[in-house]
Design a protein with these regions (language model features):
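The feature marks proteins involved in alpha-glucan
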Residues: 1-43, 71-152, 157-162
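Short proline/glycine-enriched turn/loop motifs at strand-loop junctions of beta-rich domains
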Residues: 47-54, 63, 85
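Short beta-strand elements bearing conserved aromatic residues within extracellular beta-rich modules
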Residues: 54-56, 90
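Short amphipathic alpha-helices and their capping/turn segments at secondary-structure boundaries
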Residues: 138-140, 171-182
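Ligand-site clamp/hinge motif
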Residues: 163-173
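Aromatic-lined carbohydrate-binding/catalytic grooves of carbohydrate-active enzymes
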Residues: 165, 176-209
Length: 209
């Protein structure tokens, strides 16, 4: 598969058009760092319609803007990279319309550094859902005709086990507590990526991480 075929298949012109007209319903599939299993490469894509140029920089290319330049289609800059692993760090080096160079993290990143570190991170994993029983139960239950009592919480301050918050570890205890207290639903404060723990998630820096 040559480069033009890669572009047509993994940065489809129709999807770019839908995004630019505000009609894309699955923009996260078009943008960001996505692993393309068929070609064993990661595709990077970022929307920067007014940029003069964009390049991918990361720990895999020495953070050198000259090594991985990106190409443009309809305001979206993209490139394909082989051999990356989960945890590789990256950013976009953008030359703006006025010639200023800025380094930006990926707004569609699936994984990000935290605290004072601001690089995006490559993610090649996947999650296998095993909630078939619950989904069937939910489909059969008329939530509009059932009592509802919602428990809102911030996971990091509800209980923090040694080593930090662990969703899998905290789930059984949280479910038991809410059941005993008579709650029917749990509402979690923001879980998207944010830089400052004290904000309880209200300073979002990445909706997909």
């Amino acid at each position: 598969m040559n480069y033009s075929e890669l572009i047509d298949k993994y940065v489809p012109a129709d999807d770019v058009f839908l995004f630019n007209t505000g009609c894309a319903q699955k923009a996260w599939l078009l943008l960001g760092c996505r692993y393309m299993d068929e070609i064993k490469m990661h595709r990077f894509a970022v929307w920067a319609p007014n940029a003069q140029s964009v390049s991918l920089v990361g720990d895999f290319n020495g953070w050198d803007p000259a090594k991985t330049p990106m190409e443009k289609r309809g305001g979206i800059w993209y490139c394909f990279v082989e051999g990356l692993k989960s945890g590789n760090l990256y950013k976009y080096c953008v030359t703006t319309s006025v010639g200023k160079t800025v380094w930006k993290s990926d707004p569609f990143a699936q994984w990000s550094q935290s605290g004072v570190n601001t690089a995006s991170m490559v993610w090649t994993g996947s999650h296998i859902w095993r909630d078939e029983v619950f989904m069937r139960y939910r489909a059969e239950k008329n939530c509009f005709a059932s009592p509802m009592s919602i428990y809102e919480l911030h996971l990091g301050s509800w209980k923090t086990p040694e080593g930090g918050v662990n969703y899998a570890a905290i789930a059984p205890e949280l479910a038991k507590y809410c059941t005993e207290m008579g709650f029917t639903h749990i509402e979690l404060l923001p879980l998207t990526e944010y830089p400052y723990p004290g904000s309880w998630g209200y300073q979002v820096t990445g909706y997909y991480a």
